A protein has these predicted regions:
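Outer-membrane beta-barrel architecture
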Residues: 39-45, 63-67, 80-84, 98-100, ...
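Outer-membrane beta-barrel "beta-signal"
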Residues: 50-52, 61-68, 162-178
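C-terminal or internal capping secondary-structure element at the end of a domain, subdomain, or sheet
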Residues: 142-176
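Transmembrane beta-strand segments that form the barrel wall of outer-membrane beta-barrel proteins
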Residues: 46-54, 81-92, 114-125, 147-157
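Residues on the lipid-exposed face of transmembrane beta-strands in outer-membrane beta-barrel proteins
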Residues: 68-74, 87, 101-107, 117-121, ...
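Short loop/turn motifs that connect adjacent beta-strands in outer-membrane beta-barrel proteins
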Residues: 25, 33-42, 75-82, 108-115, ...
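Cleavable N-terminal export/targeting peptides
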Residues: 1-41, 177-178
Length: 178
């Protein structure tokens, strides 16, 4: 039952995300409905990990995955595109500490929504017999008041299953590195 509640909560957040792009009328908050929040060159962000959901619900995976990392926007090679790098550590679904660095790109397809992918180089005792590995990690992000809520597909380490699950984390902007 608890697993179903988590899935419903995530679906509700994603569904209500479209409502968050509506204009907010308030004396305290400026109207930013026409503003695009593209991550600008040199911007640094703090990744706060999270949660995960898995396709095999009976496997007993750990779905509370605390962790921390940094995201850096290298450049904006074209309008709506950002080239970024990540370096993070988190407690993975198999109850081991996982580390990764990644290079990726994202495309902002709507005011608050972006889609992207990264090539990650990671290491955890849980995967690939503890040896470092490369993985292609696709994802989607929703930005609200400069906070970015990210969801990425967790790739499988075997050819039997293409997707293991979905991980959710947040990126908090720290300002410009320049």
């Amino acid at each position: 039952m608890f697993s179903m509640l988590k899935m419903l909560a995530i679906a509700a957040i994603a569904g209500l995300g479209g409502l968050c792009t509506q204009a907010v009328e308030s004396e305290d908050l400026p109207d930013e409905t026409n503003r695009t929040f593209e991550q600008t060159e040199g911007e640094l962000g703090l990744n706060i990990f999270g949660f995960s959901l898995h396709t095999d619900r009976s496997a007993g995976y750990n779905e509370v995955n605390p962790g921390i990392g940094l995201r850096y926007a290298f450049c904006n090679p074209a309008p709506r595109w950002t080239l970024f790098g990540d370096a993070s550590i988190y407690y993975d679904s198999n109850r081991q500490w996982a580390k990764y660095v990644a290079l990726g790109t994202s495309y902002r397809f709507a005011t608050s929504w972006m889609v992207g992918a990264a090539v990650a180089y990671g290491q955890s005792r849980s995967y690939n017999h503890g040896k470092p590995f490369f993985a292609l990690v696709p994802g989607i992000g929703f930005e609200y008041r400069r906070l970015v809520f990210n969801a990425v597909l967790l790739p499988s380490e075997t050819a039997d299953s293409k997707i293991v699950g979905l991980a959710v984390f947040m990126t908090i902007p720290l300002g410009h590195g320049q």
